[in-house]
Amino acid sequence: MKKYLLFLVLSVALLPASVWGQANLSQIDSLIKRMLPEASEVGISVYDLTAKKSLYTYRDTKLSRPASTMKLLTAITALSRPDADNPFRTEVWHDGVIEHDTLQGNLYVVGGFDPEFDSLMMDSLIEEVITFPFSVINGQVYGDVSMKDSLYWGHGWAWDDTPEAYQPYMSPLMFCKGAVEVTVVPGSLQGDTASVSCKPVSSYYTLTNRTKTHTPSAGKYSLSRDWLTNGNNLIVTGNVPTFRKDLINIYDSGSFFMHTFLERLRAKGIVVPESYGFTELPSDGAEQMARWETPVQKVLNQLMKESDNLNAEAMLCRIASQATGKKRVTAEDGIVEIMKLVRNLGHDPKDYKIADGCGLSNYNYLSPALLVDFLKYAYSQSDVFQKLYKSLPVLPDHHKKMLNN
């Protein structure tokens, strides 16, 4: 629903004047009265970017929960920065020395909050690591998650939205968006246990399969995990009449990354410690071994086209890190930068409430007028607009027909 809300706002906000000129704009008022449920509220702002004039407003300063339209403010603020094109980085470093096929030192994986870091990228990073002349690590393997604070959810996020994948446990070390894709295929005979497979493959989680094929008495299909105790036993139960594919989040993302990283190093023949830890990369005496970079445009496209909450929060964290230059940044550090742009566009930040970067929080309150002013600003800045425009969702043909009618 939030994805479609963002899509609808962009469709209305960016329509050219020629489209609106075909209809009597004054009829929108009667349409609002006729279509909206009694006692409901709406705010509308329609602006012609080419002619630089407002075409229609209706309570455009009214505050409402923006849902995923909040992503516009986060994306535009991020793109407005002079360092906007810097990629998202995940790095591997080591200290100590390499002697006789052994690393006499520690390995560090430094997270840069890359929300697109997936299984193939993990393999690529490991392939770089194993080019170094050692097969034994006589030290520790650490994850460095010091980029942000330890809060894994945004302010105002609902605790019982977990284990939905749209609310992942955030960390500077994200792996496959902190989620597992579960594919379920019914068996050939009624009553058979369905086939269940998971991606990415990792021993970090376990699986319990209590499904039955074409068996309504088995109950409604369900995918969950023991999330109240932060467990990662994926539990698949109930009737499976047809093929299905679902996502479920995993607790917690940094540990999911590091566990899988060690597991795959072992699979490549590297002798590693039994466990991992978390600490900061030393300020000196360390050498970089490997690095993966994800372009900002890729992160932005997923953010806007798919209304990806994780990508929006990664952008917010990145804004905070770039603006402050410090470690352990908070969401508030990023929100301060968004509010600076709000003020620069002629609005009073005290008139609005921003709690996160993606709009998942129920504490956010924005207005149509503010959203349109952000779009106007983006349009006026060619560097910002070109990147933002590429990332916007494309109107499907059947929706175009609906608008034309």
Q: Where are the model-predicted features located?
A:
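Conserved serine DD-peptidase/penicillin-binding transpeptidase domain
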Residues: 30, 81-349
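Small-residue-rich helix-loop
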Residues: 34, 55-57, 306, 316-405
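Short active-site loop at a secondary-structure junction
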Residues: 57-77, 81
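Bacterial Sec-dependent N-terminal signal peptides
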Residues: 1-27
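Buried hydrophobic packing segments
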Residues: 74-79, 261, 315, 371-375
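Beta-lactamase-like hydrolase cores
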Residues: 21-62, 88, 123, 127-132
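A general secondary-structure junction signal
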Residues: 46-48, 94-96, 143-147, 280, ...
